[in-house]
């Protein structure tokens, strides 16, 4: 009898549950169908699944090639492509100043929230993830002047010391003595350089990757995993609240606890005068400037805000700079004529083999400038749609189509960099000469107009009020180390026919740039 009752109860329960779940699935299907049919974005072309669910984006982002896919979609569908139920990706350089304006009326979306931290149950938004224009301006104002070119130039001695140590370590490991001739994973060493520069300009002390020659504290690996996580949850921000920001149990990437601890300890040591062994007040670093900002803006900057500033420097200041360096070196080496022209341009610097090229000198090298600009065009550090909410009044596209307020629009720097109306029919090819004037074919006036058009279409560092705050520092690092490496060393790819590997997790990381190094002959 008990067995019969148990079977009967189980059957009855299934009879009740099955219709419930059936009704739930039916309701979801109806909801998706109605949402799809009434969406104001339905008329815009794109993959069918992209119009139904953000899972389409998550799938392709996870594969690490979404920038290439998006470019192919624009070639297929045109300048307007629907990439999610409420998101349209635009290949319209003429709208950059509208969507990414200094007014901030096209607000950042929740896409960026995944890079925030959570402390004592409260989500802490940083300069990158803060979407409110007024709050962002309030956070940025106390430190903005320190990131201008005039603000970062006093940091050049810190960068000089790090470049000098990079050269010493490269010579020890790959050029001199019994280790001469070993293949060098130059991309990895340039990453160590950029991370150590961040430590040097922020705390006056390198983190130690160049000295040890590997990711000894796993911070770089953790940073990569954190970016992999961010790239995925940014496509469907609710996932971040269910995982990393879960109020009950955190399910997320490895935390930046070590970076937080480094930042806190350096702040304590500085305030207590315990870092005099490596900190020289006559060579101020960012921590000095943040403490100064606390005194000047006490209502905005407290110790917690200083830690936030320090962490932004640490987390965001190294990867994109290394990506640009890797791209410039890789594309130059893949094109021997380009590398030869760089060597010729720096031949006068080669006579002083111990020199660390000053930024002013490097900046005045026209072909080096062209190579770096072209490398950033071909391989921007960020290569995803930079989302913004359309304001209430909506957006009228150049072709007359209308996108209502509340929808999301954005542009991908990688896609814009292949727009043939700006860059020409050879937009898919690395050609530094496009940044230079050919006196036999172009007047100065025509060149300046073309240069203006190219600059206006460049979204490498963002634009408007949310332009990358670390742009000047990053470019100083890139110009100085590129000029120094080219002037000092003969560099060739270990496999000239091989290709690097890239993975797009918002930042487009590279690997597989192995080279042979030797000193330049006199």
Regions found by a protein language model. Name each.
Residues 320-333, 481:
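Short, small-residue alpha-helix embedded
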Residues 108-120, 154-325:
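Cytochrome P450 heme-thiolate monooxygenase catalytic core
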Residues 49, 156, 160, 180, ...:
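Cytochrome P450 I-helix active-site segment
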Residues 171-172, 336-339, 453-454, 467, ...:
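Cytochrome P450 heme-binding "Cys pocket" and the immediately downstream C-terminal segment
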Residues 2-138, 160-165, 193, 219, ...:
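N-terminal membrane-proximal hinge/A-helix region immediately C-terminal to the signal-anchor transmembrane segment
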Residues 1-7, 508-522:
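C-terminal helix/juxtamembrane-tail motif
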Residues 145, 311, 359-360, 437-478, ...:
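Cytochrome P450 heme-thiolate "Cys pocket" and heme-binding signature region
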Residues 411-448:
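Conserved cytochrome P450 K-helix/beta-meander segment immediately N-terminal to the heme-binding cysteine loop
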